[in-house]
A protein has these predicted regions:
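Membrane-proximal, non-transmembrane interface segments of integral membrane proteins
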Residues: 1-51
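Cytosol-/stroma-facing membrane-proximal "stalk/adaptor" domains immediately downstream
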Residues: 29-89
Length: 89
C-alpha cells in the first residue's frame, strides 16, 4: 500500500553519523557513543522525536539503553500535549 511505502521511506535528522551503529546492541554503547545520540535527541524538536526513533529503527540502529527512558519520556509528554489539544477542541 501507499501508506506502507511512505512509512518505510527513511528520513534523516542530520544524523548520518549514527549509521556507524547499525546492528549494535542497545547495551553495547560507550558513554561517548551514547552522547552522540543525545546530541541529536536534544537538537531535534519534540514533535520530531518519534519520527527520529522510527528513522533509526528503519535503518537498523538500536537506541542506547541509557537513552531509552529519556526518549520515551519526551514522546510520552508530546502525546499528552496532543491529546490535551484534541480535548480542548
Amino acid at each position: 500500500s501507499l501508506l506502507a511505502a511512505v512509512s518505510k521511506k527513511i528520513e534523516y535528522y542530520d544524523d548520518e553519523e549514527l549509521d556507524q551503529f547499525i546492528g549494535k546492541a542497545g547495551d553495547a554503547y560507550t558513554e561517548e557513543e551514547t552522547e552522540m545520540f543525545r546530541d541529536v535527541l536534544y537538537t531535534t524538536l519534540d514533535v520530531e522525536v518519534a519520527g527520529w526513533v522510527r528513522s533509526l529503527q528503519l535503518r537498523g540502529i538500536e537506541l542506547p539503553d541509557d537513552l531509552k527512558d529519556e526518549v520515551f519520556l519526551i514522546i510520552g509528554e508530546r502525546r499528552n500535549i496532543e491529546v490535551k489539544k484534541a480535548d480542548d477542541r
